[in-house]
């Protein structure tokens, strides 16, 4: 039991008690800005008297103004005297949250450095940057999912109480002042800025405070997974112990002793033994997958176990409807922009023994990945490249650009789509997307020159849109040479590129 208690509190040896004074250091905010936190400078520039640099005096005053209860009274009294020091919640919440997130990451960064140094001493070099790609998950799924039967699709629950977010850090950060500021900050801006809203499953983050709340969310998920992985390992190790086929696993140690004694004396028969199959776990975008080769009964037990686990251990209201049991051969799922499924690939083998010949029907499971055409067209329609039905339209906001810039932007989007969906088993959908972007580019150029698409291409030449004709080949040339005609079949095969770290929203590409 003591071993379990030690494991339930992960290795938090890097506990620092002096994080709160770092909030008043100017270099913290400079480092936070340099690390790509994208502090909204437009908010700061709207305040007269501010010289685009964070000041220690400003930070102290902003923290002081977080504690009075009547913010409206402070605003009405101070805003006329000093416009900058008036009540601007978006200003100081933005400044402090970004700097505070950077400070809270220090214990985790130090632990990562210490763990990597220990692995180097043990001659077990671990390079985390090799595991950063989104596509690194798909080869794992190809190797394992074709041999599995059921999968649990889980929506990770969000904490219903703000205190849960603060408590996830209480073992890492022993600084009471920092935790107090964190609690006050969360409660103060929960309703004012809609930092985390349960409008849909998962989390909805404020764009201005994305890093801060992604950090809190990841620490919460880490706490969930650290406990869950330990309990799963305990269950996994139990499978080496032989036990009878009992529907109830409660007190099975005592039952197996009785069964073995009875069977050995009376029946002298060999017991049918079974083992818990290994569980494969994948987490992505607020969701997680538990896949196994076990039966529906086993997956149903894991479903109710997870519900009780989150409700009891994290006091989170978790509904059974957030976990779905699906059979891999009969269900496809939206996984990282792909429609993934395991389909049966039938094949027929002719066999002959002496004078007798017969046919054998064989079905091989194959992990299939398809391009979701409807969501892609929806993204293109949202970005004004086509209608909701997939009819290409011009992009008016790009009409003021030069012809080369317009073609370059359309070509860049097309190449990125071909690059990301190169792992698809069927690429016909990509050519439809390519057609939409190509015709949208032509209509944008025709709109700029006040002409029709046919007249513009006839006057400028069809080679003007050659960017789209070679988009796929240019992407694949990162690995294979385009000049080799013998590799034509390679372009039709799936290729997982390990340099893709994120999915860019086309609607935000302006």
From Swiss-Prot:
Keywords: Chloroplast, mRNA processing, Plastid, RNA-binding, tRNA processing. It holds the Pfam family Intron_maturas2. GO terms for cellular component: chloroplast. Its main location: plastid. GO terms for biological process: mRNA processing; RNA splicing; tRNA processing. It is found in: Plastid, Chloroplast. GO terms for molecular function: RNA binding. PANTHER family: MATURASE K (PTHR34811:SF1). Usually encoded in the trnK tRNA gene intron. Probably assists in splicing its own and other chloroplast group II introns. Belongs to the intron maturase 2 family. MatK subfamily. This is Maturase K. The gene is matK.
């Amino acid at each position: 039991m003591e071993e379990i208690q030690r494991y339930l509190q992960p290795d938090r040896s890097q506990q620092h008690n002096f994080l709160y004074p770092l909030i008043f250091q100017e270099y913290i905010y400079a480092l936070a800005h340099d690390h790509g936190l994208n502090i909204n400078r437009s908010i700061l520039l709207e305040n007269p008297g501010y010289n685009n640099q964070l000041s220690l005096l400003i930070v102290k005053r902003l923290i002081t103004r977080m504690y009075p209860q009547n913010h409206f009274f402070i605003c009405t009294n101070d805003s006329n005297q000093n416009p900058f020091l008036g009540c601007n919640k978006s200003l100081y919440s933005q400044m402090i949250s970004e700097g505070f997130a950077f400070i809270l990451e220090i214990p985790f960064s130090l632990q990562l450095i210490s763990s990597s140094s220990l692995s180097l001493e043990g001659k077990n070099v671990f390079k985390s940057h090799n595991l950063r790609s989104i596509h690194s998950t798909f080869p794992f799924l190809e190797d394992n999912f074709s041999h599995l039967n059921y999968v649990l699709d889980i929506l990770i629950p969000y904490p219903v109480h703000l205190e849960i977010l603060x408590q996830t850090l209480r073992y890492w950060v022993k600084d009471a002042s920092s935790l107090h500021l964190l609690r006050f900050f969360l409660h103060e801006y929960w309703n004012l800025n809609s930092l985390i809203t349960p409008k849909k499953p998962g989390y909805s983050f404020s764009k201005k405070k994305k890093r801060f709340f992604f950090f809190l969310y990841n620490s919460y998920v880490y706490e969930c997974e650290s406990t869950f992985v330990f309990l799963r390992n305990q269950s996994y190790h139990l499978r080496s112990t032989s036990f009878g086929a009992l529907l109830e696993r409660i007190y099975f140690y005592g039952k197996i002793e009785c069964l073995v004694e009875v069977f050995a004396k009376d029946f002298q028969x060999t017991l049918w033994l079974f083992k818990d199959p290994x569980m494969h776990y994948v987490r992505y975008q607020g969701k997680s997958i538990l896949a196994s080769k076990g039966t529906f009964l086993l997956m149903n037990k894991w479903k109710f176990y997870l519900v009780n686990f989150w409700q009891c251990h994290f006091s989170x209201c978790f509904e059974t409807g957030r976990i779905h049991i699906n059979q891999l051969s009969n269900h496809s799922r939206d996984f990282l922009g792909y429609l993934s499924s395991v389909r049966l690939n039938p094949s027929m083998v002719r066999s002959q023994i002496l004078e007798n010949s017969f046919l054998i029907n064989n079905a091989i499971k194959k992990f299939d990945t398809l391009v979701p055409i409807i969501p892609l067209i929806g993204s293109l329609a949202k970005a004004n490249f086509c209608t909701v039905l997939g009819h290409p339209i011009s992009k008016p906001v790009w009409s003021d650009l030069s012809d080369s810039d317009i073609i370059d932007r359309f070509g860049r989007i097309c190449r990125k789509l071909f690059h990301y969906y190169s792992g698809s088993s069927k690429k016909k959908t990509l050519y439809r997307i390519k057609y939409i972007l190509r015709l949208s580019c032509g209509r944008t150029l025709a709109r700029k020159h006040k002409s029709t698409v046919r007249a513009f291409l006839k006057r400028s030449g069809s080679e003007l849109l050659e960017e789209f004709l070679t988009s796929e080949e240019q992407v694949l040339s990162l690995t294979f040479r385009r000049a080799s005609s013998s590799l034509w079949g390679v372009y039709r095969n799936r290729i997982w590129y390990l340099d893709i770290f994120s999915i860019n929203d086309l609607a935000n590409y302006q």
